[in-house]
Structure formats: C-alpha cells, structure tokens
Amino acid sequence: MTASTAQADATTEVFDHHLSAFAKGIDELMKDYDDGSVIVTPEKSHRGVAEIRAFFQAFLDGAEPAFWEAFKVTSKSTEGEIAYLAWEAKPFVPLATDTLFVKNGKIAVQTFTAFPA
C-alpha cells in the first residue's frame, strides 16, 4: 500500500464515520475533531472543539425529524486528504456542500455551505 493510498483510506474512514455519527449524537460526531480543527462557513469560522460542538449542537437542535427523513447524499468523493460531500434535505435545504481536510485521523478543516430554499 502506498502512502497516498493509505491517506485516501484514512480520509474515507474519517469521512464515513462523520456521516454515520449524526445518527449517534453529538459526542460521536465530536470524535472526528480536535482542538486544532476549524469549520469555515459563510457566516463564521468555528475553531476548536468547544465552538465546533456548539455549531453542531445548534444544527442538530434545529433539525426537525422531517429534515432527517429528507436528507440525501447527492455526491461523495475523496482524493488524498480531501473529502467532498454534496447533499440535500428538500424542502429544508435544496443543496449543501461540505469539504473536509483530514489529517492524522481528524478533520483538520471543514467548509460548509447550505444554499437557501
């Protein structure tokens, strides 16, 4: 296995865990981040586990059950340390994208943009 293949496998592992963690709750979701992690959104950059936890807690608290029923991944790919996700939860979110930079088994940087309905 080459170093690039190992990195791609590690990225895929973190990415898949991140997606499945939403169903398990905030503590499971936070396992993908550390104190050096940052989530960049159009509104603000959320730095470190405390701010990232607050960001996700607000997201989870604001999502009604119908949101999760409508949630659908429309595109998913990994390339080395980068993972990309496009998703929808119509009519709540017609399109959203996430890009993750994975380093040392954690999401080091994530971008998130949800396009309004």
Describe each region flagged by the PLM.
Residues 26-78:
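A solvent-exposed, acidic/Ser-Thr-rich amphipathic alpha-helical stretch
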Residues 33-34, 89, 114:
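Short beta-strand segments enriched in hydrophobic/aromatic residues
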